[in-house]
From Swiss-Prot:
GO annotation (BP), single: mRNA splicing, via spliceosome
Protein name: Splicing factor U2AF 26 kDa subunit
Domain notes: The second zinc finger in necessary for interaction with GFI1 and for alternative pre-mRNA splicing events. The region 162-220 is essential for the nuclear import of the protein in spite of the absence of a nuclear localization signal (NLS). This region is essential for the interaction with C1QBP, interaction which is required for the nuclear translocation. This region may be involved in the localization in nuclear dot-like structures and it also confers the ability of nucleo-cytoplasmic shuttling.
Gene: U2af1l4
Phenotypic effect of disruption: Mutant mice show defects in circadian gene expression and jet lag phenotype, but the master clock is not strongly affected. Per2 expression is rhythmic, but Per1 expression becomes nearly arrhythmic as well as Per1 target genes, such as Dbp. No splicing alteration was observed in the brain. Mutant mice show a faster adaptation to experimental jet lag, which is consistent with the circadian splicing switch providing a buffering system against sudden light changes.
Entry PTM: Isoform 3 is rapidly degraded by a proteasome-mediated degradation pathway.
Organism: Mus musculus (Mouse)
Outcome, altering residue 195 to A: Does not impair nuclear localization
SUPFAM superfamilies named among the record's database cross-references: RNA-binding domain, RBD
Length: 220
């Protein structure tokens, strides 16, 4: 019996523990869920809840009407956000194996930033310190996440461009960063954590901020 319960833990067959929380670290039912959300006491992965704000969803004019933001502007805004958060966390807490940002619209997933550190101790320290910090005018809510394999958490239909649930899908729709930024961030090892420089010698993040003051982000 014990072996059977262990084999179905966190799966659809498990009637006690929430499979969505186990796979994704979030559940649309929240505290009202009829199944248990077993929050980990240790993990390599942390989640920063609702941290990223897509300007296409939030941009408004003074009269409250929706302000159009182009796809190019959104990608630049997102790359700046991603680089700043990744660099800041890696410099302060330790080497990051993987960082992912949800582009879903559901309240339990929108803007969630998942950061998988190489060491569990670094993740634990990050959670303890980040919950006392602010970013971009909002309090940071960080917690350890059960997610370690993002292949199990992602919507496969979305990756193939075929998800019919849209932004309210309960599996992760991960927003990609630009190819150049991916090479810059993941191409450098733990001994090279300073922000990458362009061929001009300037740090891209600083250059982008001077060019686009409206797209500045608050530091931790």
């Amino acid at each position: 019996m014990a072996e059977y319960l262990a084999s179905i833990f966190g799966t659809e067959k498990d009637k006690v523990n929430c499979s969505f929380y186990f796979k994704i670290g979030a559940c649309r039912h929240g505290d009202r869920c009829s199944r248990l959300h077993n929050k980990p006491t240790f993990s390599q992965t942390i989640v920063l809840l609702n941290l990223y704000r897509n300007p296409q969803n939030t941009a408004q004019t003074a009269d409250g009407s929706h302000c159009h933001v182009s796809d190019v502007e959104v990608q630049e805004h997102y790359d700046n956000f991603f680089e700043e958060v990744f660099t800041e966390l890696q410099e302060k807490y330790g080497e990051i194996e993987e960082m992912n940002v949800c582009d879903n619209l559901g309240d339990h997933l929108v803007g969630n930033v998942y950061v998988k550190f190489r060491r569990e101790e670094d993740a634990e320290r990050a959670v303890a310190e980040l919950n006392n910090r602010w970013f971009n005018g909002q309090a940071v809510h960080a917690e350890l996440s059960p997610v370690t394999d993002f292949r199990e958490s992602c919507c496969r239909q979305y990756e193939m461009g075929e998800c019919t649930r849209g932004g309210f899908c309960n599996f992760m729709h991960l927003r990609p960063i630009s190819r150049n930024l991916r090479r810059q961030l993941y191409g450098r090892g733990p001994r090279h954590r300073s922000p990458p420089r362009s061929h001009t010698g300037h740090r891209p993040r600083e250059r982008n901020r001077r060019r686009s003051p409206d797209h500045r982000h608050g530091r931790f």
